[in-house]
């Protein structure tokens, strides 16, 4: 079953809108890609978007680009686990990375600043404990 992002047929009053046309292909969406922490190989998924462009989505990753704000340097470090995720409390148990998630890395805790399901990479900024 596909995801449709058009207007609902139901009015706030409970009545129905009578559609003047059918559903269109450009109103379709997709299920979200949930980026997982994994020891296995880095896995991405390429998706064709509007205009024939490509969007790279991270499916599995074990590394993140972490910026140290004190020194201004960026390092590629191994992700150990997801500590906190405000998007969904169950994402912590499943090790799903989203923007704003707190991840535990080799050099300490870091907050994810990129959108792995949209950007194709995991960028984070180191936080002080």
Curated annotation (Swiss-Prot):
Keywords attached to this entry: Ribonucleoprotein, Ribosomal protein
One GO cellular component term? cytosolic small ribosomal subunit
Spell out the InterPro entries in the cross-references: Ribosomal_eS8, Ribosomal_eS8_CS, Ribosomal_protein_eS8_arc, Ribosomal_Se8/biogenesis_NSA2
PROSITE patterns, alphabetized: RIBOSOMAL_S8E
Which residue positions does the secretion signal occupy? none
Q: A single GO BP annotation from the record?
A: maturation of SSU-rRNA from tricistronic rRNA transcript (SSU-rRNA, 5.8S rRNA, LSU-rRNA)
- GO molecular function ontology, one term from the record: structural constituent of ribosome
Tell me which Pfam families the record gives: Ribosomal_S8e
Q: Where is this region: Disordered?
A: 1-29
- Which NCBIfam families did the record assign? eS8
| Family per similarity comment | Belongs to the eukaryotic ribosomal protein eS8 family.
Q: How does it assemble?
A: Part of the 30S ribosomal subunit.
Under which name does UniProt file this protein?
A: Small ribosomal subunit protein eS8
Q: What's the source species for this entry?
A: Methanocaldococcus jannaschii (strain ATCC 43067 / DSM 2661 / JAL-1 / JCM 10045 / NBRC 100440) (Methanococcus jannaschii)
């Amino acid at each position: 079953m596909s995801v449709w992002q058009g207007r609902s047929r139901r009015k706030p009053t409970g009545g129905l809108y009578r559609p003047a046309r059918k559903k269109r292909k450009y109103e379709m969406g997709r299920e979200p890609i949930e980026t997982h922490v994994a020891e296995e190989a880095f896995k991405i998924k390429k998706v064709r978007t509007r205009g024939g462009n490509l969007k790279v989505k991270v499916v599995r990753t074990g590394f993140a680009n972490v910026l140290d704000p004190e020194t201004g340097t960026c390092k590629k470090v191994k992700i150990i686990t997801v500590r906190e995720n405000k998007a969904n409390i169950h994402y912590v148990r499943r090790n799903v990375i989203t923007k704003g998630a707190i991840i535990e890395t080799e050099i300490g805790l870091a907050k994810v600043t990129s959108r792995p399901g949209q950007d194709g990479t995991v960028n984070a900024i180191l936080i002080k404990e």
